[in-house]
Amino acid sequence: MISVGIVGGTGYTGVELLRLLLRHPQVTVRVLTSRTEAGKRVADMFPSLRGHTDLEFSDLNEDVLKQCDVVFFATPHGVAMKYAKGLVAAGVKVIDLAADFRLQNLEQFEKWYGLEHECPEILKDSVYGLSELNREKIKTAKVVGNPGCYPTTVQLGLAPLLQADVALIKPENIIIDAKSGVSGAGRKASLGMIYSENADNFKAYGVAGHRHHPEIVEALEHISGQKGVFDQIIFVPHLVPMIRGMLSTIYIDLTEEGANSDLQSLYEIYYANEKFVDVMPANSSPETRSVRGANELRIALYKPQPNKLVILSVQDNLVKGAAGQAVQNMNLMFNLDEDTGLTGIGLLP
């Protein structure tokens, strides 16, 4: 059995991670930490877990974490990098669900997160954890940076086009119009997240610049092998009055080659063997509720004009966009079937 530690167990991603791991046939959750709830039974805070765990929250103790096989950090940015070096030295694998190991560009990390990176040598050897695109590197990784939720929808939405043998799109003209449920903002109380601020309301945020923009740019450069062509991408996220779910609508200008290509077949072939990416029939409309609670991402393509392409990409922001993808990465790191513990079907309605 894989001995697991979770640092940060009271947030939405932390409890979602615990929910998934408690059902995992190869995992024992050894420790679950909280800065504020040490000594409290997990099931008392989250009644949905009653009968499934006797765990109590505990203070973060690095010596205890070093007895685990893998430690997940479901914490704010800046926490995992404080402990990664010591854990790696002790032979413990690390999966960070925050941003400490997403960006290889230290200047961009410090600019967007306002933190000086505490272990750049570990960052250099870490692997970006988008399972479908980096699985071979993830298998041998000691530290994995779990991707951001929005960047996951964008990368999987664009990868078949960017890795084609010929230029199919004009990358400098990409527009990403993304929407997320409010759970993406976390569980910490804040004025902007209360019911009366979000119910019956719909708003954009981070329009002048969002932390996921540099992550998207760096990742697309890696996928395509092209530098400097994605800097002008427009990315605008929105907050919608629902709890879970994320939909990214990606607008693309096609090259002449792209306009004359069978893009539906391109996507179907590219993702044919992927367990967690579903390419829907042409002109379908993927809905967030179809992936609620599941580690799945659904994609649909539209060509409203001969030289235009619209990509729709949906996922549960807490599962494929966070905790589920982290478990998927753990499975790869421990040479398990990638879908172990992740075969749940989306909830409907």
From Swiss-Prot:
Active-site residues from the entry: C149
Reactions the enzyme catalyzes: N-acetyl-L-glutamate 5-semialdehyde + phosphate + NADP(+) = N-acetyl-L-glutamyl 5-phosphate + NADPH + H(+)
GO biological process, any: L-arginine biosynthetic process
Signal peptide: none
Pfam family, one: Semialdhyde_dhC_1
Chief subcellular location: cytoplasm
Biological role stated in the UniProt entry: Catalyzes the NADPH-dependent reduction of N-acetyl-5-glutamyl phosphate to yield N-acetyl-L-glutamate 5-semialdehyde.
Family statement: Belongs to the NAGSA dehydrogenase family. Type 1 subfamily.
Protein name in the entry: N-acetyl-gamma-glutamyl-phosphate reductase
Species of provenance: Acinetobacter baylyi (strain ATCC 33305 / BD413 / ADP1)
